[in-house]
UniProtKB/Swiss-Prot annotation:
Belongs to the metallo-beta-lactamase superfamily. Glyoxalase II family. One of its GO terms (molecular function) is metal ion binding. GO terms for biological process: methylglyoxal catabolic process to D-lactate via S-lactoyl-glutathione. Binds 2 Zn(2+) ions per subunit. Monomer. NCBIfam families: GSH_gloB. It is an enzyme of class 3 (hydrolase). SUPFAM superfamilies: Metallo-hydrolase/oxidoreductase. Its cofactor is Zn(2+). Zn(2+) 2 binds at residues 70-71, 150, 188. Keywords: Hydrolase, Metal-binding, Zinc. This is Hydroxyacylglutathione hydrolase.
Protein backbone atom coordinates (compact mmCIF):
# COMPACT_ATOMS: atom_id res chain seq x y z
CA UNK A 1 0.00 0.00 0.00
CA UNK A 2 1.29 3.46 -0.89
CA UNK A 3 2.06 5.92 1.86
CA UNK A 4 -0.73 8.43 2.25
CA UNK A 5 -0.71 12.06 3.35
CA UNK A 6 -3.04 13.57 5.92
CA UNK A 7 -2.40 17.13 4.80
CA UNK A 8 -2.24 18.70 1.37
CA UNK A 9 1.07 20.54 1.21
CA UNK A 10 1.45 23.08 -1.57
CA UNK A 11 4.22 24.93 0.23
CA UNK A 12 7.34 22.90 0.97
CA UNK A 13 7.78 24.78 4.24
CA UNK A 14 4.46 23.53 5.56
CA UNK A 15 4.56 20.35 7.57
CA UNK A 16 2.58 17.22 6.76
CA UNK A 17 2.23 13.75 8.23
CA UNK A 18 2.23 10.66 6.03
CA UNK A 19 1.35 7.02 6.68
CA UNK A 20 3.59 4.15 5.62
CA UNK A 21 1.81 0.82 6.25
CA UNK A 22 4.24 -2.08 6.81
CA UNK A 23 4.19 -5.69 8.01
CA UNK A 24 0.71 -7.00 8.76
CA UNK A 25 -0.86 -3.95 10.40
CA UNK A 26 1.88 -1.55 11.53
CA UNK A 27 1.80 2.08 10.47
CA UNK A 28 5.00 4.10 10.44
CA UNK A 29 4.19 7.80 10.58
CA UNK A 30 6.50 10.18 8.73
CA UNK A 31 6.29 13.86 9.65
CA UNK A 32 7.98 16.12 7.12
CA UNK A 33 8.75 19.80 6.72
CA UNK A 34 10.90 21.14 3.92
CA UNK A 35 13.56 18.52 3.22
CA UNK A 36 13.59 17.12 6.78
CA UNK A 37 11.68 14.15 8.16
CA UNK A 38 10.86 12.70 11.56
CA UNK A 39 9.93 9.01 11.61
CA UNK A 40 7.79 7.48 14.35
CA UNK A 41 8.33 3.88 15.47
CA UNK A 42 10.06 2.41 12.39
CA UNK A 43 9.28 -1.30 12.56
CA UNK A 44 11.52 -1.97 9.55
CA UNK A 45 13.94 0.26 7.69
CA UNK A 46 13.84 -0.51 3.97
CA UNK A 47 10.42 1.00 3.11
CA UNK A 48 11.31 4.11 5.11
CA UNK A 49 14.66 4.49 3.36
CA UNK A 50 13.03 4.13 -0.04
CA UNK A 51 10.28 6.60 0.83
CA UNK A 52 12.72 9.24 2.10
CA UNK A 53 15.30 8.79 -0.65
CA UNK A 54 12.70 8.93 -3.42
CA UNK A 55 11.58 12.30 -2.08
CA UNK A 56 15.14 13.51 -1.38
CA UNK A 57 14.40 13.90 2.32
CA UNK A 58 16.88 13.75 5.17
CA UNK A 59 16.09 11.95 8.42
CA UNK A 60 16.23 14.46 11.29
CA UNK A 61 14.96 12.23 14.09
CA UNK A 62 13.26 9.01 15.11
CA UNK A 63 10.58 9.08 17.80
CA UNK A 64 10.20 5.87 19.80
CA UNK A 65 7.05 5.39 21.86
CA UNK A 66 8.17 2.12 23.46
CA UNK A 67 10.66 -0.71 23.18
CA UNK A 68 8.77 -3.47 21.33
CA UNK A 69 10.58 -4.92 18.32
CA UNK A 70 7.86 -3.95 15.86
CA UNK A 71 8.48 -0.32 16.82
CA UNK A 72 12.26 -0.10 17.06
CA UNK A 73 13.29 -2.84 14.63
CA UNK A 74 14.35 -0.53 11.80
CA UNK A 75 15.99 2.27 13.76
CA UNK A 76 19.61 1.11 13.78
CA UNK A 77 19.56 0.44 10.04
CA UNK A 78 18.17 3.93 9.42
CA UNK A 79 20.99 5.38 11.50
CA UNK A 80 23.53 3.74 9.21
CA UNK A 81 22.21 5.92 6.38
CA UNK A 82 21.56 9.00 8.54
CA UNK A 83 24.09 8.80 11.40
CA UNK A 84 23.33 12.32 12.62
CA UNK A 85 19.64 11.66 13.18
CA UNK A 86 18.47 11.95 16.78
CA UNK A 87 16.67 9.07 18.47
CA UNK A 88 14.16 10.27 21.05
CA UNK A 89 12.96 7.75 23.64
CA UNK A 90 11.96 7.45 27.27
CA UNK A 91 14.81 7.81 29.75
CA UNK A 92 13.18 5.00 31.73
CA UNK A 93 13.62 2.75 28.68
CA UNK A 94 17.33 3.38 28.23
CA UNK A 95 18.08 -0.25 29.07
CA UNK A 96 15.70 -1.44 26.33
CA UNK A 97 16.35 1.33 23.79
CA UNK A 98 20.09 1.83 24.39
CA UNK A 99 20.67 3.68 21.11
CA UNK A 100 18.55 6.67 22.16
CA UNK A 101 20.39 10.00 21.89
CA UNK A 102 17.73 12.24 23.44
CA UNK A 103 16.30 10.77 26.63
CA UNK A 104 13.01 12.32 27.70
CA UNK A 105 10.62 12.25 30.62
CA UNK A 106 7.02 13.22 31.19
CA UNK A 107 6.22 16.83 30.26
CA UNK A 108 9.59 17.42 28.61
CA UNK A 109 9.44 19.64 25.54
CA UNK A 110 11.75 19.26 22.58
CA UNK A 111 12.04 21.15 19.30
CA UNK A 112 11.75 19.22 16.04
CA UNK A 113 11.23 20.65 12.56
CA UNK A 114 10.91 24.09 14.19
CA UNK A 115 7.94 22.87 16.21
CA UNK A 116 7.50 22.19 19.90
CA UNK A 117 6.81 18.57 20.85
CA UNK A 118 5.60 17.66 24.34
CA UNK A 119 6.28 14.25 25.89
CA UNK A 120 3.41 12.52 27.70
CA UNK A 121 3.94 9.50 29.95
CA UNK A 122 1.19 7.00 29.07
CA UNK A 123 2.16 3.74 30.78
CA UNK A 124 -0.08 0.68 30.54
CA UNK A 125 0.88 -1.24 27.42
CA UNK A 126 4.46 -1.04 28.71
CA UNK A 127 5.84 0.53 31.87
CA UNK A 128 7.71 3.33 30.08
CA UNK A 129 5.40 4.02 27.13
CA UNK A 130 5.33 7.66 26.02
CA UNK A 131 3.39 9.72 23.48
CA UNK A 132 4.41 12.83 21.57
CA UNK A 133 2.01 15.78 21.37
CA UNK A 134 2.27 18.46 18.68
CA UNK A 135 0.17 21.53 19.56
CA UNK A 136 -1.49 23.57 16.83
CA UNK A 137 1.12 25.06 14.55
CA UNK A 138 -0.23 28.49 13.59
CA UNK A 139 2.27 28.78 10.75
CA UNK A 140 0.97 25.55 9.20
CA UNK A 141 -2.67 26.06 10.26
CA UNK A 142 -2.76 22.40 11.27
CA UNK A 143 -4.83 20.72 13.96
CA UNK A 144 -2.86 19.42 16.95
CA UNK A 145 -1.60 15.85 16.69
CA UNK A 146 -0.48 13.06 18.99
CA UNK A 147 1.70 10.06 18.17
CA UNK A 148 0.47 7.58 20.76
CA UNK A 149 2.04 4.27 19.74
CA UNK A 150 0.17 1.33 21.26
CA UNK A 151 -1.66 3.17 24.05
CA UNK A 152 -4.72 4.51 22.23
CA UNK A 153 -5.96 2.78 19.08
CA UNK A 154 -8.87 3.54 16.80
CA UNK A 155 -11.78 2.32 18.98
CA UNK A 156 -9.35 0.44 21.23
CA UNK A 157 -6.32 0.46 23.50
CA UNK A 158 -3.16 -1.57 23.88
CA UNK A 159 -2.95 -4.86 25.73
CA UNK A 160 -1.67 -4.63 29.30
CA UNK A 161 1.69 -6.34 28.93
CA UNK A 162 3.50 -4.51 31.75
CA UNK A 163 1.09 -1.99 33.22
CA UNK A 164 -2.20 -2.25 35.07
CA UNK A 165 -5.74 -1.32 34.17
CA UNK A 166 -5.32 1.70 36.43
CA UNK A 167 -2.24 2.76 34.45
CA UNK A 168 -4.12 2.47 31.17
CA UNK A 169 -7.19 4.24 32.53
CA UNK A 170 -5.04 7.19 33.58
CA UNK A 171 -3.18 7.18 30.26
CA UNK A 172 -6.38 7.26 28.21
CA UNK A 173 -7.91 9.94 30.39
CA UNK A 174 -4.78 12.01 29.97
CA UNK A 175 -4.81 11.68 26.19
CA UNK A 176 -8.48 12.60 26.15
CA UNK A 177 -7.70 15.85 27.96
CA UNK A 178 -6.03 17.00 24.75
CA UNK A 179 -8.10 19.27 22.48
CA UNK A 180 -11.02 17.42 20.91
CA UNK A 181 -9.79 18.07 17.36
CA UNK A 182 -6.37 16.54 18.08
CA UNK A 183 -5.52 14.00 15.37
CA UNK A 184 -4.67 10.58 16.79
CA UNK A 185 -1.78 8.78 15.07
CA UNK A 186 -1.57 5.29 16.55
CA UNK A 187 0.82 2.59 15.41
CA UNK A 188 -1.52 -0.19 14.23
CA UNK A 189 -4.53 -0.46 11.93
CA UNK A 190 -6.89 -2.23 14.34
CA UNK A 191 -9.90 0.06 14.05
CA UNK A 192 -12.28 -2.19 12.13
CA UNK A 193 -11.70 -5.21 14.39
CA UNK A 194 -12.10 -3.03 17.48
CA UNK A 195 -15.38 -1.62 16.19
CA UNK A 196 -16.72 -5.08 15.34
CA UNK A 197 -16.07 -6.10 18.93
CA UNK A 198 -17.63 -2.92 20.31
CA UNK A 199 -20.66 -3.29 18.04
CA UNK A 200 -21.17 -6.90 19.14
CA UNK A 201 -21.06 -5.73 22.76
CA UNK A 202 -23.32 -2.71 22.18
CA UNK A 203 -25.42 -3.33 19.04
CA UNK A 204 -27.74 -0.47 20.01
CA UNK A 205 -24.95 2.15 19.93
CA UNK A 206 -25.58 4.22 16.80
CA UNK A 207 -22.26 6.10 16.94
CA UNK A 208 -20.28 2.86 17.00
CA UNK A 209 -22.41 1.32 14.23
CA UNK A 210 -22.00 4.36 11.99
CA UNK A 211 -18.25 4.46 12.52
CA UNK A 212 -18.01 0.74 11.75
CA UNK A 213 -19.82 1.24 8.43
CA UNK A 214 -17.51 4.13 7.52
CA UNK A 215 -14.31 2.32 8.52
CA UNK A 216 -15.34 -0.92 6.77
CA UNK A 217 -16.00 1.03 3.58
CA UNK A 218 -12.59 2.69 3.79
CA UNK A 219 -10.80 -0.58 4.39
CA UNK A 220 -12.59 -2.25 1.46
CA UNK A 221 -11.22 0.54 -0.75
CA UNK A 222 -7.71 -0.07 0.59
CA UNK A 223 -7.69 3.18 2.56
CA UNK A 224 -6.60 3.57 6.18
CA UNK A 225 -9.00 4.39 8.99
CA UNK A 226 -6.39 6.65 10.59
CA UNK A 227 -5.71 9.23 11.83
CA UNK A 228 -8.66 9.38 14.16
CA UNK A 229 -9.39 12.26 16.53
CA UNK A 230 -9.78 12.62 20.26
CA UNK A 231 -13.44 13.58 19.79
CA UNK A 232 -14.08 10.44 17.70
CA UNK A 233 -12.48 8.23 20.36
CA UNK A 234 -14.52 9.89 23.08
CA UNK A 235 -17.69 9.03 21.11
CA UNK A 236 -16.95 5.47 20.01
CA UNK A 237 -14.07 3.97 22.00
CA UNK A 238 -15.38 1.79 24.84
CA UNK A 239 -12.06 1.94 26.70
CA UNK A 240 -12.06 5.73 26.61
CA UNK A 241 -15.70 5.74 27.72
CA UNK A 242 -14.94 3.48 30.71
CA UNK A 243 -15.86 5.20 33.97
CA UNK A 244 -13.09 3.65 36.05
CA UNK A 245 -10.19 1.21 35.92
CA UNK A 246 -12.38 -1.72 36.99
CA UNK A 247 -14.64 -1.24 33.99
CA UNK A 248 -11.62 -0.88 31.72
CA UNK A 249 -10.11 -4.10 33.10
CA UNK A 250 -13.34 -5.98 32.38
CA UNK A 251 -13.46 -4.60 28.84
CA UNK A 252 -9.81 -5.46 28.25
CA UNK A 253 -10.34 -9.03 29.44
CA UNK A 254 -13.42 -9.40 27.24
CA UNK A 255 -11.61 -8.02 24.19
CA UNK A 256 -8.58 -10.26 24.78
CA UNK A 257 -10.84 -13.32 24.71
CA UNK A 258 -13.11 -12.18 21.88
CA UNK A 259 -12.99 -13.91 18.50
CA UNK A 260 -14.59 -12.23 15.50
Amino acid sequence: MEATSTAATSDKQRSSIHALPVLQDNIIWIWIKGDQAVVVDPAIAEPVKTWLQTRKLSLAAVLQTHHHADHIGGTLELLRDWPNAAVVAAADDRDRIPFQTISVRDRDKISLLNSSVEVLAVAGHTRAHIAYYLPTNKEDREDPAVFCGDTLFGAGCGRLFEGTAEDMFKALQRLCCLPAKTRVYCAHEYTEANLRWASALHPEDIAISERLVDVSSRRQRGALSLPSSISEEQRTNLFVRAQNSKELAELRQHKDQWRN
